[in-house]
UniProtKB/Swiss-Prot annotation:
GO biological process annotation, one example: translation
Protein name in UniProt: Small ribosomal subunit protein uS10
Organism, scientific name: Bifidobacterium animalis subsp. lactis (strain AD011)
PROSITE patterns (alphabetical): RIBOSOMAL_S10
Pfam family, one: Ribosomal_S10
Lineage: Bacteria, Bacillati, Actinomycetota, Actinomycetes, Bifidobacteriales
Amino acid sequence: MAGQKIRIRLKSYDHEVIDQSAKKIVETVTNAGATVVGPVPLPTEKNVYCVIRSPHKYKDSREHFEMRTHKRLIDIVDPTPKAVDSLMHIDLPADVNIEIKL
């Protein structure tokens, strides 16, 4: 797989879980003999939702909720076949979204 690069994007609502997952991916791939760049923290996406507290009137009384999406980027430069195989068999939490591009 000479000259290739694998790019992994991780997304999660919990920053501790995403950091643990990124650390696990980096350890697994480096033990398999590939070079890793990252994890690079990307900007956190913050969505704010404004909801009226009362179902009927009192429109001035509102409540704000926010949802933060944390993102990390990991690049694997010149991956070995063993590194790709170990990457496919790694076990990560369900609340971490993983996008892998070759």
